[in-house]
Each structure stands twice: as C-alpha cells, then as structure tokens.
C-alpha cells in the first residue's frame, strides 16, 4: 500500500478532514481566509483518498499559470506527483498521480478534460472556485469537464461572486440564514 507524508493539521483542517472522510461526499467546499492552509488541507484529502484507493487520479484546477507550479511543488512535498506541464495537446504522463491545469485550459477544451477525469476514479480540486465564473467559458467548461467525477473539492476565501453569478457545483439554498460546518478564529487559522 502506498503511503504519503502526513503533516500536522491545524484544528480547522482536522475537523474538516474528519467531516469529509466520514461521508466522502461528491462535493465539498472549504472556505478559509488566505494563509489559513487550504492547499495543505486539500492535499491531505488527496493523499487520504489516493492511499485508500478511493481515487486513482488527482486534478487541480487553478486560476493562473504560476499557481500550477506552486501546487505541483506543494504536492511533491507530501509525495504526490502532479504534472504542471500538462497541456491541451499532450497526453497524461502515466508516471504522475495527476495534473494541474488552469480554468482557461479547461474552458478551451472541456471534452478533453472530461476524458482525462473520467478515465480513472478522480478527485478534482477547484482552487479559488469563485474564479470559475470570471469568463462564462470557464464556468461552463468546468461544469462540462467535471460533472461526473467521483469527488470535487472546492476551495475559496470568497464563497460568493460580486456579480452574483453562481459558482459551479455550489448548491445554493435560500433559507434566510447561513449555517457553519466548521469554524475557527483568526488565531487558530
């Protein structure tokens, strides 16, 4: 059985990880301030799911090119090999655990990304998911590409958009009040 490097988690990360692992839902959103550890949290979920063979591939979707390398480097530190050089004209490197792509890449060729995601049991991490509505093609592409994946983990510090566009895979329920799932203070972040 393959094992990954486990780092100590902050209290909010451990609480959210426990909540995720209890049910392993198709959709899960982590909302946390910048610097709170969303990347670390997401990579822990990825390694847990890879380790227990719930998923066989990890795809990370980011808003900008420079974040592709950042995510790949962070993943390498926990033993997860994510290819930041994957392009819409290349094949998936079979020696890698997954890929890191931009929302723009997915928007340009959603059917290619759908094929990559559906070829194996997949976790898709949608970093800064609120950006998926920045260009209509980004949100539409993400929905087309990842509608049927096993697990989607959305990360954001901003769980809403100023233009009121819906964020893909976020369920909106107008109940007049919000409900927290996991909370933490700035000090605990």
Predicted features along the sequence, with ranges:
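Conserved RecA-like helicase motor-core motifs
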Residues: 80-89
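Conserved small/polar residues in nucleotide/adenosyl-binding loops
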Residues: 185-189
């Amino acid at each position: 059985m393959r094992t990954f490097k486990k780092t100590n988690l902050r209290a909010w990360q451990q609480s959210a990880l426990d909540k995720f692992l209890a049910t392993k839902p198709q959709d899960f959103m982590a909302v946390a301030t910048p610097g709170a550890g969303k990347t670390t949290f997401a990579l822990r979920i990825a390694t847990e799911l890879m380790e227990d063979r719930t998923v066989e591939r990890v795809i990370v979707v980011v808003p900008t090119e420079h974040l592709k390398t950042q995510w790949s480097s962070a993943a390498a530190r926990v033993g997860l090999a994510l290819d930041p050089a994957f392009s819409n004209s290349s094949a998936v490197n079979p020696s890698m655990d997954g890929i890191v792509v931009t929302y723009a890449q997915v928007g340009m060729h959603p059917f290619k990304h759908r094929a990559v995601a559906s070829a194996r049991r997949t976790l898709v991490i949608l970093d800064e998911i609120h950006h998926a509505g920045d260009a209509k093609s980004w949100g539409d592409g993400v929905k087309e590409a990842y509608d049927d994946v096993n697990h989607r983990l959305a990360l954001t510090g901003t769980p809403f958009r100023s233009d009121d566009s819906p964020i893909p895979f976020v369920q909106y329920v107008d109940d007049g009040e919000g409900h927290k799932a996991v909370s933490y203070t700035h000090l605990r972040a």
